[in-house]
């Protein structure tokens, strides 16, 4: 059963990342609408999860730990940071401006086909634009830059702290053995 789910998730993700045909264009459009220039990340996660389900043949339980929290903070800081601009939107214009940006990225006379060369103007998608506008309207753009930097640093620390500590411990053990 999980093998079938894994295969379906893998195939849908591959179709989306290839951006061919109506279904591929639609999946890419939805992902770009939500995540902007990071539209490929959900597809890469889908491919990885699909492989995992196919190969392991057992259910995957998401463990909420500090590493996952760090990855989420890094993702949020990337989405917000890529949506910041020199002239922040207000709540009344954020959705209209984003809709204009994504409409400009759509190929003429098509519904969902995006020009991937024009996707850079989308920033972090509607998620990033909303969060950036929320932060800019409450703590100004300078405060938002500070929040993005802090989110990134905390996320990196939470993600890699255990790994760095293990490397330091192993190097200390190696030095002790070398001295003996």
Go through the PLM ranges and name each one:
Residues 1-179:
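Alpha-helical transmembrane segments used as membrane anchors
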